[in-house]
């Protein structure tokens, strides 16, 4: 599986550098998600901009990541540009479950705003 991870203070970006997110890649991807979560990554941006095809195993990996970050931080799906990937997400109605943001830059802004909001809330509770 080809991918890159860009780690920052408030978020990490995992960019999948494969055409297909399928049953051959999904198990390794799930393992990487678990590793990043256990490493303490609070917000994960998952970039699918290179991906042209996702099967049910790929969707399962994405949903696994969403569950891992549900009560911990943010899991954001970005770069969902290919029509077949968009269609699969639409048919599966995952846009109502997942946080999907068009670009990496917008995803970073989203994480930044959420981080500021959390800091403000914790300041008012003290």
Task: Report each predicted region and the residues it spans.
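General small-molecule cofactor/ligand-binding pocket signal
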Residues: 6, 99-101
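Thr-Gly-centered strand-to-loop micro-motif
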Residues: 15-16, 23
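Amphipathic alpha-helical interaction surfaces in cytosolic regulatory modules
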Residues: 21-98
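A charged, well-structured terminal subsegment
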Residues: 102-125
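Short, flexible active-site-adjacent loop segments at beta-strand->alpha-helix junctions, enriched
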Residues: 18, 81, 104
């Amino acid at each position: 599986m080809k991918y890159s991870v860009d780690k920052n203070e408030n978020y990490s970006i995992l960019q999948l550098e494969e055409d297909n997110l399928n049953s051959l890649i999904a198990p390794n991807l799930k393992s990487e998600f678990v590793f990043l979560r256990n490493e303490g990554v609070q917000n994960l941006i998952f970039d699918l901009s290179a991906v042209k095809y996702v099967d049910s195993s790929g969707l399962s990996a994405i949903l696994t990541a969403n569950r891992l970050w549900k009560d911990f931080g943010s899991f954001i799906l970005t770069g969902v540009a290919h029509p077949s990937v968009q269609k699969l997400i639409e048919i599966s109605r995952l846009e109502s479950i997942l946080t999907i943001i068009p670009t990496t830059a917008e995803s970073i802004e989203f994480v930044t705003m959420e981080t500021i909001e959390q800091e403000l809330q914790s300041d008012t509770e003290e």
